[in-house]
Amino acid sequence: MAQFYYKRNVNAPYRDRIPLRIVRAESELSPSEKAYLNAVEKGDYASVKKSLEEAEIYFKININCIDPLGRTALLIAIENENLELIELLLSFNVYVGDALLHAIRKEVVGAVELLLNHKKPSGEKQVPPILLDKQFSEFTPDITPIILAAHTNNYEIIKLLVQKGVSVPRPHEVRCNCVECVSSSDVDSLRHSRSRLNIYKALASPSLIALSSEDPFLTAFQLSWELQELSKVENEFKSEYEELSRQCKQFAKDLLDQTRSSRELEIILNYRDDNSLIEEQSGNDLARLKLAIKYRQKEFVAQPNCQQLLASRWYDEFPGWRRRHWAVKMVTCFIIGLLFPVFSVCYLIAPKSPLGLFIRKPFIKFICHTASYLTFLFLLLLASQHIDRSDLNRQGPPPTIVEWMILPWVLGFIWGEIKQMWDGGLQDYIHDWWNLMDFVMNSLYLATISLKIVAFVKYSALNPRESWDMWHPTLVAEALFAIANIFSSLRLISLFTANSHLGPLQISLGRMLLDILKFLFIYCLVLLAFANGLNQLYFYYEETKGLSCKGIRCEKQNNAFSTLFETLQSLFWSIFGLINLYVTNVKAQHEFTEFVGATMFGTYNVISLVVLLNMLIAMMNNSYQLIADHADIEWKFARTKLWMSYFEEGGTLPTPFNVIPSPKSLWYLVKWIWTHLCKKKMRRKPESFGTIGRRAADNLRRHHQYQEVMRNLVKRYVAAMIREAKTEEGLTEENVKELKQDISSFRFEVLGLLRGSKLSTIQSANAASSADSDEKSQSEGNGKDKRKNLSLFDLTTLIHPRSAAIASERHNLSNGSALVVQEPPREKQRKVNFVADIKNFGLFHRRSKQNAAEQNANQIFSVSEEITRQQAAGALERNIELESKGLASRGDRSIPGLNEQCVLVDHRERNTDTLGLQVGKRVCSTFKSEKVVVEDTVPIIPKEKHAHEEDSSIDYDLSPTDTAAHEDYVTTRL
């Protein structure tokens, strides 16, 4: 295949080697640019600064050059998290480009802050974003800094950007037909979809919601619901949208985890944001929890804090209920269940009485309703047993006593469903599958009652049941009543939700029903296909003569595939093995037809039994396992829905007492009629300003309390998120890389400090020497006419016999050499021990007038290793000659070998009282061999000898050194 990718030379042999070359070659970097980028990579601050300064002067380096990986110097510094280099590069106005996005992706908060505060030069050309070439950029055009920061979920970076006033585009709906959406989708549908996904991914960031949303709970609820709906529409990005939806749900749950008291929890769960300040609202109706159930926020609802509050309200009348023995619980529930008629009558007569208030408790209400439904099932059982039998041959039998007792329950169920639909709305009503089951059950009972009435009115004769018509109203009513009994018994499963053991099982059963419906759709298609084929094959062989029973339900099955309906029944019952194989035979000797029919029948059984049935088992197993993995959350969510239905104010009385008008219901009815029918005659009394003001104040107080609690929750959540991130971070390869980078940067910083200290010390020495020269020239007047300029450094060697001995002992030197460092003014009291402080520097030798000629050769010491022995010997001989004359001449001398050495600069100040010595700082730098101009020689005289000594400064023009001897001290200046 190589010939498809590489050009082959015609004259080359067949087994020639494939030449390789770089097809997409890029421009090479110059050595200076490579060194510049390498210095940035290693964190060499001094080299980078030097390169940037040279680039401004000589223009030899492109400071915006790119390495083979496509990184500029700024991006390399951001990747290495070197804030000093980033600040340096920005000060030289390097090209920023996507540096802010790279810093956000790298989560370098300091770099992001520097880039946000960096102001571009006014002369820089501003290119519109639409004209920028984004082909080689790592980020798509729709990625803005705030969107990328939200993707990384870095709270600090998001806060910095939000403080700058950034904004996020509002995503349009999937079915939006505006001009912008239509044009964007037509131009590039993929970019349009990815852009919407990136925006939603940013909006779903927990840090962004916590920082910018006034009501984070409501934002998380609505966004998770919207993302869940988007996952159903955009199947291409279904997994991404579902993951974002789960992220929003988890954020709401984690935020609720931060509540620390029941007061905070009640403020959160009772907050209502859909009312204005002047509208009256209840402060204890769990409005936020109802909203969470509506948006199916299972993690939020099943959160332990929320469940604890619900449980405390559920068992309000029975504190410590869960700690009681199960036998005590059962006996208590049984007694309350038996007394539910008494409680109901008391509530009808006196709703505000103790018993009337007792039945309004959620737990008591649940027990009473359950006892009422169990009584209804008991009546159904009695009706099915026909205890009070009537004449079975009567075509229109009258209702029995049990049926008369069942009728109030049926009417009570119907009235309860009507009230529920009226209060919650049709949409909320049909979303609950149990309501649909109740609707079917009540419809069957209504149809049964109607048919019973028709049969009782129309048919009164006695006829044997065998002679009745197939569609006789009594027969149809009995069939519908039997089906309704099944639904009524199965409806009891909904009460299993209250139990922790049966609740998860009931939820798994409901999920399996969905799998069964999916399976039935495919199975019906297969069933209809084979039924059509078999009926087409056996239609011509229908048997009608000599048969007392026709069909597959006969003792001897026949005509199994004669009609389409009969074929469907035969194929269905064949799954359970109830159809014999001989039904594929025909009376005629048509073996081919029998073979084809048997083959079709066998193929159907293989597909339905082996494939489809096992697929159904696998689907049901998967659904059960899914529920089992989240059994606690699913069960608590279902139980909360059951509890919330009993927390409502209405529906206190159980069936059948709910059909009896209570005094409260009659009062509400009269009030409604009076308001709607007589509203023209009477005007509504306006509320006073005081009432409106108090209501507004209460609502405003609730709002402020909610915002205060929300502020505390957000702070706790952010702190917990940061702690968790630090805990889970651990040691990674990236950390090791950062550590190496820090070590490298520290190394170059130390080297830079050493080089910088050399230059700074030289400059300070020059300044100090210049000042000293000026002072001397002013004090001496015009006695010395011409003096040469101060040299680059001023080296002073102080010689004292005792000090030299001490220095020799401490430094293991034969001549006690050391350097003198200048003391700051605040440390003048330590001048006595200055030799110990400067023992590692310069030239220090001991001189004495008595034995100068003997010790001179052994007391000269050189710090620089580059000074040759010959130069040292020559300097020694010259010094001996000068000392033999009693003075040292002054002049210009070339000092070789001081290429890289440390010297100490001595600065002396003259006062009227004393001659003080200030020891200069160490100078470490690189010097070339140069002429050193020595201006004068100043003796250093102790205080006690100051009165006996005179200024012996003597000028010499061409002497290599200038030395003045004063008793025990000799001053030598180069």
From Swiss-Prot:
One of its GO terms (cellular component) is plasma membrane. Disulfide bonds join 549-554. The chain crosses the membrane at residues 363-383, 404-418, 433-453, 476-498, 512-534, 600-620. Abundantly expressed in brain (hippocampal CA1 pyramidal neurons, dentate gyrus granule cells, and cerebral cortical neurons, and in the septal nuclei and the mitral layer of olfactory bulb). Lower levels are detected in other tissues. One of its GO terms (biological process) is gamma-aminobutyric acid secretion. Residues 615-974 are annotated as: Interaction with ITPR1, ITPR2 and ITPR3. This is Short transient receptor potential channel 4. The lineage of its organism: Eukaryota, Metazoa, Chordata, Craniata, Vertebrata.
